[in-house]
Amino acid sequence: MQPLVIIAIAALVVAIIIAIVVWTIVYIEYRRIKRQRKIDCLIDRIRERAEDSGNESEGEREELSKLVEMGHHAPWDVDDL
C-alpha cells in the first residue's frame, strides 16, 4: 500500500474514535440535563403546594428522593419556604 492510503485509513479510524467519544459525552450530558429538569420541576411543584396548603405532597417528595438518590431526606429544608 502507498503511504498516503495508510495515512488516510489511520485518519479515518481516529476520526471515528473521536466521533464516538464526543457523541458519548453528549449523550451523558443530555441525560444529566434531562434528569436535572425533572428534579427542578418536582421542586417547583413541592414549593407551590407548600405555599398553597402549608405542606408538601409526600408522593412528590418520594419521587424527588428517588431522583436524587438521597433516601427520603432532601438536602434542603422544604418546610421553611
From Swiss-Prot:
Record-annotated membrane-spanning stretches: 8-28
Compositionally biased region (Basic and acidic residues): 62-81
PTM info: Phosphorylated by host CK2. This phosphorylation is necessary for interaction with human BTRC and degradation of CD4.
One cellular component (GO) term of this entry: membrane
GO annotation terms (biological process): receptor catabolic process; symbiont-mediated suppression of host innate immune response; symbiont-mediated suppression of host type I interferon-mediated signaling pathway; symbiont-mediated-mediated suppression of host tetherin activity; viral release from host cell
Domain of life where this protein originates: Viruses
Signal peptide: none
GO molecular function: CD4 receptor binding; monoatomic cation channel activity
Main location: host cell
Subcellular location: Host membrane
Membrane topology note: Single-pass type I membrane protein
InterPro entries reported in the protein's UniProt record: Vpu, Vpu_cyt_dom_sf
Cytoplasmic side: 29-81
Residues recorded as bearing Phosphoserine in the entry: 53, 57
Free-text function comment from the UniProt entry: Enhances virion budding by targeting host CD4 and Tetherin/BST2 to proteasome degradation. Degradation of CD4 prevents any unwanted premature interactions between viral Env and its host receptor CD4 in the endoplasmic reticulum. Degradation of antiretroviral protein Tetherin/BST2 is important for virion budding, as BST2 tethers new viral particles to the host cell membrane. Mechanistically, Vpu bridges either CD4 or BST2 to BTRC, a substrate recognition subunit of the Skp1/Cullin/F-box protein E3 ubiquitin ligase, induces their ubiquitination and subsequent proteasomal degradation.
Free-text note regarding domains: The N-terminus and transmembrane domains are required for self-oligomerization and proper virion budding, whereas the cytoplasmic domain is required for CD4 degradation. The cytoplasmic domain is composed of 2 amphipathic alpha helix that form a U-shape.
Protein name per UniProt: Protein Vpu
Species this chain originates from: Human immunodeficiency virus type 1 group M subtype D (isolate NDK)
Gene that this polypeptide is encoded by: vpu
